[in-house]
Amino acid sequence: MKMPITFDPAKHDITLRKRGLDFADAAKVFAGRHATISDVRRDYGEPRYITAGWLSERMVVLVWTPRDNARRIISMRYAHAKEEARWRKFLG
């Protein structure tokens, strides 16, 4: 199911400046081959998910929550080598 992408503009700007990643590009990750797990590391007061997928031939990891029929992006970063190896099991 295609859901719109939303995000906090200030977090977006910080991530774009520090990591060169644009939260708006999360739609490309969800449109391609990706895997999602529930983020149960602690109680956030809302459901959170961790998704790994491909963006311009590099693996990225997103943390997001469903909100108002959209995916609200909380964070986005490039996967580390060990992390990428773990996610590849799910992504094939």
Residue ranges and their predicted role:
Residues 1-92:
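Ribonuclease/tRNase effector modules and their secretory precursors
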